[in-house]
Amino acid sequence: MGMKMTKEPDFGVGLDIGTMNIVSARSTGPNKVGTIRVRDAFIDLDVADKKTLRLSKVDYVEMDGQLIVIGDSALNMANLFKREIRRPLLKGIIAPGELLAQQVLSLLVFNVIKEPMTPDEHCFFSVPAPPLDDPSQDTTYHREIFRKIIAEHGYTPHP
């Protein structure tokens, strides 16, 4: 009897880094794609607010002596605490002057790509084009920052 050869599944994840949302897409089966979206937003809160976050069942990360809430939860907490949300991306580029931008972007990216399914799994990513009001804006630095972030999470990045 002949042996039937089965092809190993192809792994890989697509990552769209947009100004409003960061979205990943991954094959979940034959002709099926699953997506995960996170809002490109965060809020920093005092450690004293930890109890409120726990009671609200909101995920957070402790960073540099403060609590960081990301995504849609950040919008909800901003309303609750009457605070403005912060954005790590501004007009498609890493927000200049936002000290936590790279750390928060790493959290947001990991939130949607998760752990690699195989060592050095491929991650194909896109970054926003230069802003329409400033087409001369070079996005090379920003693309390379995302390449670094993705590699730090165990993926082989491809812009």
What are these regions (language model features)?
Residues 1-36, 40-66, 70-159:
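Nucleotide/phosphate-binding catalytic cleft detector across ATP-hydrolyzing
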